[in-house]
Amino acid sequence: QGGCNDVLSAETTMMVKERFAETYGPPVHTIGWGGSGGAMQQLLIAGAYPGILDGILPTLTFPDAISYFIDTAECRLPLRRFLNGRNPPLSDDVKNAIGGWADWDVCERSLGPRPNRIGPDDCPASIPLDARYHPVDNPGGVRCSIYDGMRNVFGTRAYDEVEPTPVQPFGRSPQDNVGVQYGLEALNRGLIDTGLFLELNEQAGGWDIDFQWRRERAAADPDALRIAYETGRVTSGSGGLATTPIIDERNYLDHVANFHASYYSFVMRERLVRDNGHADNYVLQRRMAPLSRADENLALMDEWLVAIALDATADHAAAKVVGAKPAALRDACWNDDGIEIVEPAVFDRGAIFNNTQGRCNELFPPHAGARIVAGGPLTSDVLKCELKPIDPADYAVPLTSEETTRLESIFPDGVCDWSKPGVGQVPNTRTWLSYGPSPVNRYQ
């Protein structure tokens, strides 16, 4: 699978482009095109290695792999385990309120069974079974998590949380859920009661480096956090993306409980707004299959890039990108009859359980995820939150002294302070980093 290694993907793209230039001559411009994992690759390559791709056409967008793994990991272990195992059983409506999903099957049948990219057993068929890692039978075997596959980026360390004691160092992991109050906004909107909120967070637990459930919350490696942000493995709105033309065509799948949730497009847009003050180089189009804008968007991207190339002014590159955008490129959606509705794409953070503001949101309402319901930002890129003391003012429902004491025992070090950037979180301003063996522009 390549382990979602976007650095390898960037190098591969660069080599293909080089081969094309040697065979046919220099390309006029290079346009990224693809969905889901292909969207991740485009955004990560354009952000961390600007110039390989001149413009990008992502579909079924995820901003990057690592922040997307927050949703898959938390559904797969803490939430799915608790929500399915509770007695008496919980209704699907209650489960959806805790996760923010359009339907419980988003977690149960779509996110939950996804390939375990952060676990050691996500190996391609080319690696023989007897060569693969097992904590008891083959502790020195090949580990296939994204972080083990990117050891030259994330580095390694000894982990003593696995039994028996490992005989090899493992790739550093930035995944974390310390201080996360699952279901907080569901509690504050009256969708769950205090007893369930406390029970959920008391029993959610976390996972170890082998992605096995444990009672303790998952704790990120501090160096892995720093590396994830500084190197652009978590996509920010800065770096190369600040000057990249982006047309995001979103095939709406929320209604069929597909993990390609439409809110990820709004996540990417919000990162651009946060880091650049705007997202004017980003166009969001929403529609339902079988309608497709692929041919039209390719032609519009070509027109956009030609106009940028013809701009001989001394303006900053970001201003040229915005100024050259074709007039026909606007946020829009298309109804079942193929009629275009032009209006700004809006995600109302205050209406995550009923995001139907505007005609396009009425047709294609974006939903959320468990971290959003836990109070996290729409940028959805806080891997590990800063902590703060428990504050009764954060809860719309008054807590009794017994409930407060119980909450303090669940979160002895405090709860997430979502008003602050994540631990180690910085914009990605260093591009074209390398990871050895060449010393040129090597990340340290």
Model-based region annotation:
Residues Q1-Q444:
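C-terminal His-loop and adjacent cap/lid subdomain of alpha/beta-hydrolase
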